[in-house]
């Protein structure tokens, strides 16, 4: 049980454990349902119940009374799972869980959610997977994706490299969707891979009829068996269950809070469409083929990099603060072609003079930075700011973090930021990329 001090004591005092059916009375309202577990990094003082309607509700336990309605059964996840036979005719796929909706299994007898599971558990929840590959499944960590940190990218990259070295024919990463695109970019810079690395997630939990978890996971396995030996993201391509898209790891972004087709290629096209569990590679895309590269890992990152959005009321002190606090690099989300108010030029120049690289991106997301058009842009360039070209702010942030892990020489940083390492920017823009 992952409930913490306050909630844990509350449950113990009332003789309640995960899977029990309980009633929580609070003032003039009550909630009845099955007590669910919570993720390891959830806030203390709350319980989560699965109601008869199928929806989950979080209840603050302050000033409440708990009533045990019925004891629950022991969870069946991970218990008595029969061995899954290895099929030598099939490829070996590693599935690595980092937490998130897609990698959780619901035990309907207890209502418990299990983000840590075995290969047998995964097959029980998604039996169609047996048609595609043999599996090695492990939980790397169990966090909500908003709590992702650069050090976890390093752990993921090294875990992936170990699996590839051990003979895995493809990798699937199960990840929460909120920061999935950051991780996709990070792995793109950290790894040269001889096999596909596919990151997937889910917008709807697997206990909901509208869940996208099963299809995304199966299509990710299909992509991991393909010839595209790159880091990519596999998610729904439409609101229904007709197909998924494969997006380049450095050119993808979450663009909607709740839609199942939230992930879109930015300043790029999807690199493949997966329909009826078959991969149709974009004929315009020149991809790295399986075994074309030897495995290389360069996972060092600098964690103290800032991402700052320009806005009409922004003041010089915001830039000065990051300099004074010892930040090693800054990415600016400028307006339009890559602009900030002219009052920021002096602190930006100070950053450059103190060997703190600054990279300019655009809030527009689509299109590219061009600081040669207007006088303010030219002054920004003269202050030593590096163009982020058509990278998304998130990809530029990840790249700068990675580059600073390789070198702290500001001249070398500029060279690497202007070098296309993982397809993170286009040399030319195309009108077909806008809102594709």
From Swiss-Prot:
Q: For this protein, what is the EC number?
A: 6.3.5.-
Query: Which Pfam families does the annotation name?
Result: Asparaginase, Asparaginase_C, GatD_N
> Cell cycle as a keyword?
no
Reported function: Allows the formation of correctly charged Gln-tRNA(Gln) through the transamidation of misacylated Glu-tRNA(Gln) in organisms which lack glutaminyl-tRNA synthetase. The reaction takes place in the presence of glutamine and ATP through an activated gamma-phospho-Glu-tRNA(Gln). The GatDE system is specific for glutamate and does not act on aspartate.
Q: Which HAMAP family match?
A: GatD (MF_00586)
Matching NCBIfam families? asnASE_I, gatD_arch, PRK04183.1
Task: Fetch the PANTHER family from UniProt.
Answer: 60 KDA LYSOPHOSPHOLIPASE, L-ASPARAGINASE
Please state what the protein is called. Glutamyl-tRNA(Gln) amidotransferase subunit D
Q: Taxonomic lineage of this organism?
A: Archaea, Methanobacteriati, Methanobacteriota, Methanomada group, Methanobacteria
């Amino acid at each position: 049980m992952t409930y913490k001090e306050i909630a844990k004591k509350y449950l113990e005092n009332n003789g309640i454990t995960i899977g029990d059916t309980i009633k929580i009375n609070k003032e003039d309202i009550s909630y009845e349902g099955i007590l669910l577990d919570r993720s390891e990094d959830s806030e203390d003082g709350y319980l989560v119940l699965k109601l008869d309607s199928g929806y989950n509700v979080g209840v603050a336990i302050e000033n409440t009374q708990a009533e045990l309605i019925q004891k629950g059964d022991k969870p069946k996840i991970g218990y008595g799972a029969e061995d899954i036979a290895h099929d030598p005719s099939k490829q070996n796929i590693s599935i690595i869980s980092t937490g998130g909706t897609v990698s959780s299994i619901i035990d309907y007898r207890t209502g418990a959610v299990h983000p840590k599971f075995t290969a047998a558990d995964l097959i029980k929840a998604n039996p169609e997977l047996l048609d595609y590959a043999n599996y090695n499944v492990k939980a790397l960590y169990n966090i909500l994706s908003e709590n992702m940190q650069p050090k976890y990218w390093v752990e993921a990259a090294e875990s992936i490299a170990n699996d590839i070295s051990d003979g895995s024919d493809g990798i699937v990463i199960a990840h929460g969707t909120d920061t999935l695109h950051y991780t996709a970019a990070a792995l793109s810079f950290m790894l040269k891979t001889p096999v596909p690395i596919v990151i997937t997630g889910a917008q709807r939990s697997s206990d909901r009829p509208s869940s996208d978890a099963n299809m995304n996971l199966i299509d990710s396995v299909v992509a991991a068996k393909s010839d595209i030996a790159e880091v990519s993201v596999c998610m729904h391509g439409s609101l229904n269950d007709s197909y998924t898209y494969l997006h380049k790891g450095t050119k993808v972004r979450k663009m909607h809070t709740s839609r199942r087709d939230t992930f879109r290629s930015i300043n790029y096209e999807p690199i493949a469409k997966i329909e009826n569990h078959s991969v149709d590679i974009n004929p315009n895309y020149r991809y790295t083929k399986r075994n074309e590269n030897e495995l290389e890992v360069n996972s060092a990152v600098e964690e103290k990099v800032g991402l700052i959005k320009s806005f009409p009321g922004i003041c010089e002190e915001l830039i000065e603060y990051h300099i004074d606090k010892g930040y090693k690099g800054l990415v600016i989300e400028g307006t339009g072609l890559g602009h900030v108010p002219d009052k920021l030029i002096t602190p930006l120049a100070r950053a450059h003079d103190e060997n703190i690289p600054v990279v300019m991106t655009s809030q527009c997301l689509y299109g590219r930075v061009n600081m040669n058009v207007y006088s303010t842009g030219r002054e920004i360039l003269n202050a030593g700011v590096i163009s982020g070209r058509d990278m998304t702010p998130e990809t530029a942030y990840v790249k700068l973090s990675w580059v600073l892990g390789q070198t702290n020489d500001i001249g070398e940083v500029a060279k690497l930021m202007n070098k296309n390492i993982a397809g993170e920017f286009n040399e030319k823009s195309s009108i077909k990329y806008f809102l594709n």
